[in-house]
Amino acid sequence: KGIELQIEIASARFQSLKDKRRNLLGRTGCGLCGAENLDQALRLPEKKIDITFSIKETAIIKALEALHTTQSLQKKTGATHACAWANEQGEIQLVREDVGRHNALDKLIGALQKKGFNGKGFVITTSRASYEMVQKTVMLGASTLIAISAPTGLAIRSALKYGLCLIGFARAPQYVIYTFTERVTKN
């Protein structure tokens, strides 16, 4: 799960530390602000995902090949992440960009919810796959997250726990399936 440290601090030093304590209440970001331990940070998603949904290898490759053409802000600035929703055929349906990978995913989730999300497809991110990205994808109700970069160990364990198919190092035509390999079918 992670490492949690318990440290004993002298009373006078503790009071000094307490006086300097910053406000942990966060209003934007990945959702970890205000969490003082790992259990608070690792909230279990309540949404159920379709563990029977599978995607074809050709759909993954098609979406990966098309992703860079949909990133208009990245083309102008070279400084943004993108998150995209691709349908079952691998056609990019929606893309959202932001300098923050979490913000890009939040924007995508909001746009999908407004449009009427049906769950038949997959999320692609141009970033690494952290457990927060896994958590948000599961909360959306999507059954697959594909990341251009590596997943973290906690992301892999969380994906296994939630039933999410997690794919990393995805650069067409190659990728690595970390969880639920049976959900990616050959053509």
Predicted regions and their residues:
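Intrinsically disordered, low-complexity regions enriched in acidic/Ser/Thr/Pro/Gln residues
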Residues: 1-83, 88, 92-94
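Arginine residue identity/basic-tract feature
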Residues: 13, 21-22, 27, 43, ...
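Conserved active-site and cofactor/substrate-binding residues in soluble primary-metabolism enzymes
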Residues: 25-28, 33-36, 55-58, 62, ...
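Protease-associated
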Residues: 79-115
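Feature captures the catalytic cores and cofactor-binding loops of soluble hydro-lyases/lyases
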Residues: 101-180, 186
